[in-house]
Amino acid sequence: MANTPEPLTTEAAQVVSETDLGAAKLLEPSALWLEPYQWVSVAMLVLIAIMLWKKVPSLVTGGLDNKIAEIKAQLDEAKALRAEAEKLRDEYTAKIANAEKDAEAMMENARHEADAILEKAEADSKALVERRKKMAEDKISAAERDAVDEVRATAAAAAAAASRKLIAEKHDAEADRKLADEVIAEL
């Protein structure tokens, strides 16, 4: 520890005592028989008198009154703005509630419309299936009729051809005469 401070040593303390052994008394300055504290009081009274004469308190109170009026106006404006904000908040809250109700009503209406469309589509599809089924049945019955008519026509043609062949084979001119005579006799 190379840099340690050394303690300060002084000479032996000397005792000094004060005694009032006829020392002269200190006189304070005075002017016009007034002490300094009295002059301070007079100066303050003069300052206050000048302030009152120049109407400083009324200026201060007027300034304070103006500031109070300004603050009151700001407070009134703030109250009006707050009331307007609360009114707008209530209005928008009501609008949001109405919008939610409208949205719910729209959703309910959309559900009903979707159900109605679904029911109509089911009914239409059933009707379409029935129509197609009837058309198929009609086509089948028409095809059956055509087939029956064709079979009948073929059978009639075959019967006529067979009859002609049989008549041609078994009937001769004499048999024709005999048949014609019988038919005439019946008439």
Curated annotation (Swiss-Prot):
A Pfam family the protein falls into: ATP-synt_B
Segments passing through the bilayer: 36-53
Membrane topology recorded in Swiss-Prot or TrEMBL: Single-pass membrane protein
CC per GO annotation: plasma membrane; proton-transporting ATP synthase complex
Places the protein is found: Cell inner membrane
Keywords, in A-Z order: ATP synthesis, Cell inner membrane, Cell membrane, CF(0), Hydrogen ion transport, Ion transport, Membrane, Transmembrane, Transmembrane helix, Transport
GO molecular function: proton-transporting ATP synthase activity, rotational mechanism; proton-transporting ATPase activity, rotational mechanism
Subunit text: F-type ATPases have 2 components, F(1) - the catalytic core - and F(0) - the membrane proton channel. F(1) has five subunits: alpha(3), beta(3), gamma(1), delta(1), epsilon(1). F(0) has four main subunits: a(1), b(2) and c(10-14). The alpha and beta chains form an alternating ring which encloses part of the gamma chain. F(1) is attached to F(0) by a central stalk formed by the gamma and epsilon chains, while a peripheral stalk is formed by the delta and b chains.
Family statement drawn from the similarity comment of this UniProt entry: Belongs to the ATPase B chain family.
Its biological purpose: F(1)F(0) ATP synthase produces ATP from ADP in the presence of a proton or sodium gradient. F-type ATPases consist of two structural domains, F(1) containing the extramembraneous catalytic core and F(0) containing the membrane proton channel, linked together by a central stalk and a peripheral stalk. During catalysis, ATP synthesis in the catalytic domain of F(1) is coupled via a rotary mechanism of the central stalk subunits to proton translocation.
Name the UniProt record assigns to this protein: ATP synthase subunit b
